[in-house]
Amino acid sequence: MASEKQKQHAQPGKEHVMESSPQFSSSDYQPSNKLRGKVALITGGDSGIGRAVGYCFASEGATVAFTYVKGQEEKDAQETLQMLKEVKTSDSKEPIAIPTDLGFDENCKRVVDEVVNAFGRIDVLINNAAEQYESSTIEEIDEPRLERVFRTNIFSYFFLTRHALKHMKEGSSIINTTSVNAYKGNASLLDYTATKGAIVAFTRGLALQLAEKGIRVNGVAPGPIWTPLIPASFNEEKIKNFGSEVPMKRAGQPIEVAPSYVFLACNHCSSYFTGQVLHPNGGAVVNA
């Protein structure tokens, strides 16, 4: 599936330069207005899983706003924005793309304010942005890197959720992207895996807090999914063999994960789901 030419040398990775492009859409996906009239904010929505979620949400009638890394993902963001405009339904509003660094509270507040100024509210919040760096020992993880990973991967979830909740009503949904690594561990992604475990706990605790308000909180824990984060994180050998260790013997595609988010965002489909995590992971068995 991948070759040595795939290797990228900077986070968070760029989709438009990938030799084997991730699949964010499919002719087999048949929308049915599951999210008609909803306003969705997707972090890290310019590529990978976030782009596929945006595609499905827009196809299902949602108005979509997404964030991307300021100054690093402009081309991916513009391609995603154009795609969303093409697949959106006639009764949804024009999508918007917001460049930012989500690791800081003031930036997260600005993102929420921009979405609310444009669309009046937030019905679905997708906390999805992440970064990861490979290391062989804990000694390699210095304080600046540890803080950077935690700021992006879990601090931003707290920041965005806190600000977004002011504009979310009963029936709204929060969906957090965790990882199969939160359940099985990963020796070479120690700091990343720790944040993903924190996201599971955050999801379950927040679900308990918000149940009385009628706001559901769930998560998705993808397995090995082919996104720009992979060639930006691993060495050539791991890129080449990525996904081969799961029972299905291949990496998943973003479009194979995105319907899980549609399911959790749709009240008709998942009104009795909160505090739960879905596991699209190619057959890896985890203790949920």
UniProtKB/Swiss-Prot annotation:
> Mind telling me which PROSITE patterns this protein's record contains?
ADH_SHORT
Catalytic residues at: Y192
Q: Which Pfam families match?
A: adh_short_C2
Q: Which SUPFAM superfamilies match?
A: NAD(P)-binding Rossmann-fold domains (SSF51735)
Q: Which residues bind NADP(+)?
A: 47-71
Q: State the top-level EC class.
A: oxidoreductase
InterPro entries, alphabetized: NAD(P)-bd_dom_sf, Sc_DH/Rdtase_CS, SDR_fam
* MF (Gene Ontology): alcohol dehydrogenase (NADP+) activity
Ranges where the record places region Disordered = 1-32
Report keywords, A-Z: Chloroplast, NADP, Oxidoreductase, Plastid, Transit peptide
Localization, UniProt: Plastid, Chloroplast
Presence of the UniProt keyword Disulfide bond in the record: no
Q: Where is the composition biased (Basic and acidic residues)?
A: 1-18
Report biased composition (Polar residues) as residue ranges.
20-32
User: What residues bind substrate, as annotated?
Assistant: S179
Give EC number(s), comma-separated: 1.1.1.-
Q: Which GO terms describe its cellular component?
A: chloroplast
> Which family, according to UniProt?
Belongs to the short-chain dehydrogenases/reductases (SDR) family.
Functional note: Aldehyde reductase that catalyzes the reduction of the aldehyde carbonyl groups on saturated and alpha,beta-unsaturated aldehydes with more than 5 carbons. No activity on alpha,beta-unsaturated ketones. Can use propionaldehyde, butyraldehyde, methylglyoxal, (e)-2-pentenal, (E)-2-hexenal, (Z)-3-hexenal and (E)-2-nonenal as substrates, but not propenal (acrolein), crotonaldehyde, 2-butanone, 3-buten-2-one or 1-penten-3-one. May act as a short alcohol-polyol-sugar dehydrogenase possibly related to carbohydrate metabolism and the acquisition of desiccation tolerance.
What name does this protein carry? NADPH-dependent aldehyde reductase 1, chloroplastic
